[in-house]
Regions:
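Bacterial N-terminal signal peptides that target proteins for export
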Residues: 2-11
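Bacterial N-terminal signal peptides
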Residues: 11-21
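Beta-propeller folds
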Residues: 26-352, 359-361
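Conserved hydrophobic/aromatic "anchor" residues
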Residues: 52, 61, 97, 255, ...
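Non-catalytic accessory segments flanking enzyme active sites
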Residues: 205-207, 317-413, 439-442, 446-447, ...
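Glycine-rich His-Gly loop
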Residues: 357, 424-428, 588
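Cap/lid segment of the alpha/beta-hydrolase catalytic domain
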Residues: 385-497, 504-505, 539
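Active-site-proximal cap/loop segments of hydrolase catalytic domains
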Residues: 456-649
């Protein structure tokens, strides 16, 4: 079958296929209405999670229309849809092939622990296998005879072939006097479940070798601040490495190319490096590759590390095998001047699925075939957005002379001169923005605003930039944003009298801080799931998370004592008197990362002080804006608020 036909089949599904009950935007009276860019970008992606089977013969993907979602499978050389399944009213997080005939889907829900267990509301993951051949769905149930367990997954699945059977390995929870981590296995086709290993330490991870045995176990003791790696020797788990770390703990991430060493990821001088640890004698080898890595790429069947990525904004892929690197270089040549990200690949690396973003192909999924050296666009991620707004790399000097890199999205068809501006700081704060496609700045640009996304100090672009953020929460991390406004105004790119700040999570905090701690820059603010009271947030974190999590936050906030007055110094709620512009707060009722009360108390305090404030509650929404309806609700409320207080035209 020609690759063009494959693309047209996917396009037909995206436009509305009468399969699986006819998931389509079309109503009973005719064709689907024409949607605005805001409506398109506020919805979940039309096409996502495009993955190729290990043998390279089948494609699976998720198609969305409104809140209706379905997983489809099509096969090379055959017409129509091989099979498909509707996704129920749940949050589908990911799909992946576990062998040539079975897909593993990860779903989540926000809830309290099961009856009889104590703990806060959290996002619980569960896994479901979709048997493509039999068209049946099998939930992975962690039910062990004579052992109480919770039916949740606590990490990513690993898949191995053992005695010609597919075995899925998933970390989960078992119960003694409390819930504790364990490693479970599920053997197909009967889904027989076993509890392979138990741990009495909450922070535990495992590595599974090619034969399906536990090869290594990592543990971290939070109160003692000690870590240990154990490997299997002569049928027993033996300690081969240990150390201390108060925050930057190591991780075991896979195996070396020959399987003789465990690969551990370490933070050294702020950089992440990969070190091989011999399972034979516990000796450390020279770091893999050159430089530091971001993302690990493993061989599906063995867990051996075959490559990784360098860089944050400009992500570069490195493969340790020359032939694989040649395949990847061919992919890059097929998409010159475009951003290319690896999504999925066949085991022999002959067929590769990528996301591409650029002027020629917009934001799309594509298939590259090594044997034909042909690339085919499979479909747009957001159907109807074929020409996204242009993203420019910019940089400026902060007040203390530090160079800050940022990205400026400019409304399509407008000259970069005297534009209204939205400053959109990222969450984290140890995260980073890039010139990749992002639905939020694209949505704001579609309304006529330029959008500035600075990688302020604390962003994880470089180790030096991360460390520069320690102790600067609400301080230089905040003025790095307004320094960008001043620089663009000096150049004449934006109108300094028409600037607002918008953000979510830490970015939501930055939005509130921008109009309280750094007043006079912004004429309005939109805070989505933002932190308003740092002392209350710190107390909540202490009650609901491990000490290492608290130490992580304290390092950025510059806090060494929970009674430190610095918490009030950088809390927006304690500086409402300085606020003289309107604020919109938006918060998901099911948020388990930043409590909903953080917005409630800020709204109440602002109302009491007579400050202009609006509040939008997103019912049944979590911290990540996971559903299309509430994401659109947030965008529409924000757009109306911005238009009223900082009109673009």
């Amino acid at each position: 079958m020609a690759l063009e036909n494959l693309a047209s089949r996917i396009a037909a599904l995206i436009c509305g296929l009468a399969a699986l009950g006819g998931i389509s935007r079309a109503g009973p009276d005719g064709p689907a209405p024409v949607l605005s860019p805001l409506e398109i970008l506020g919805a979940l992606p039309t096409l996502e999670s495009v993955v190729i089977s290990p043998d390279g013969k089948r494609l699976a993907f998720v198609k969305t229309a409104g809140e209706a979602r379905a997983i489809y499978v099509i096969e090379f050389g055959k017409s129509g849809v091989l099979t498909g399944v509707k996704v129920a009213d749940t949050k589908l997080r990911d799909i992946e092939w576990i062998d040539d005939d079975n897909l593993l889907a990860t779903i989540s829900r926000t809830s309290l622990p099961p009856l009889g267990f104590y703990g806060p509301r959290r996002e619980w993951n569960q896994m479901v296998v979709f048997d493509v051949a039999k068209k049946k769905v099998h939930p992975l149930t962690f039910e062990i005879e004579h052992q109480e367990t919770l039916n949740v997954s606590m990490g990513a699945a690993e898949v191995r072939t053992v005695d010609n059977k597919t075995v899925i390995f998933v970390p989960g929870l078992y119960v003694e006097d409390r819930t504790l981590p364990g490693m479970f296995s599920f053997t197909l086709p009967d889904y027989r479940v076993k509890l392979l290993d138990r741990s009495g330490i909450q922070d535990t991870d495992w590595l599974i070798d090619e034969s399906g045995h536990i090869a290594a176990q990592y543990t971290y003791r939070d109160e003692q601040k000690t870590w240990e790696i154990r490997s299997r020797k002569d049928g027993r788990m033996t300690s081969i490495a240990k150390g201390t770390a108060s925050i930057d703990t190591p991780d075991i991430i896979g195996f070396s190319a020959d399987g003789s060493s465990i690969i551990a990821s370490f933070e050294e001088n702020g950089d992440s490096i990969w070190k091989p640890l011999s399972v034979k004698d516990g000796s450390w080898g020279a770091p893999l590759g050159s430089g530091t890595f971001r993302r690990v790429i493993r061989e599906r069947k063995t867990g051996r590390i075959i490559g990784g990525t360098h860089g944050a904004g400009d992500e570069r892929y490195v493969f340790f095998d020359n032939e694989m690197q040649a395949h990847w270089n061919a992919v890059l040549r097929a998409f010159p001047d475009e951003k290319v990200h690896l999504v999925s690949r066949s085991d022999d690396f002959s067929r590769i699925i990528v996301q591409v973003f650029g002027a020629q192909d917009g934001y799309s999924y594509a298939l590259f075939d090594w044997y034909s050296h042909k690339a085919t666009i499979l479909g747009q991620v957001y159907s109807g957005i074929s020409a996204p707004a242009q993203i420019r790399s910019v940089s400026y000097l902060a007040a203390d002379g530090r160079r800050i890199d940022a990205y400026l999205t400019v409304p399509t068809g407008q000259e970069a001169k005297n534009l209204p501006l939205i400053v959109l700081p990222h969450g984290g704060p140890e995260a980073a923005d890039s010139d990749d496609f992002d639905w939020w700045p694209q949505a704001l640009a579609s309304r006529g605003y330029a959008v500035l996304q600075p990688n302020f100090r604390g962003s994880n672009v470089t180790s030096d930039l991360v460390e520069a953020g320690f102790g600067e929460w609400g301080r230089k991390m905040q003025t790095d944003l307004s320094d960008g406004v001043r620089d663009l105004a000096k150049q004449g790119v934006i109108d300094p009298k028409r600037v607002c700040i918008v953000g979510a999570s830490y970015g939501g905090y930055a939005a509130l801080a921008g109009v309280t701690l750094d007043p006079g820059v912004y004429r309005c603010a939109v805070a989505v799931a933002g932190i308003s009271d740092l002392r209350r947030f710190r107390n909540w974190t202490t009650s609901n998370h491990s000490s290492v999590v608290q130490r992580y936050w304290d390092r950025f906030m510059g806090i060494t004592d929970k009674k430190a007055a610095a918490l009030e110094e950088i809390s927006p709620i304690d500086h409402i008197a300085a606020l003289n512009v309107p604020v919109l707060l938006v918060h998901g009722k099911d948020d388990t990362v930043v409590p909903y009360e953080q917005s409630e108390i800020m709204v109440n305090a602002m109302k009491k002080a007579g400050k202009p404030v609006e509040f939008v509650t997103l019912n049944h929404e979590d911290h990540w804006l996971s559903t299309g309806a509430t994401r659109l609700q947030m965008l529409q409320a924000s757009a109306a608020f911005l238009q009223a207080n900082n009109p673009a035209h």
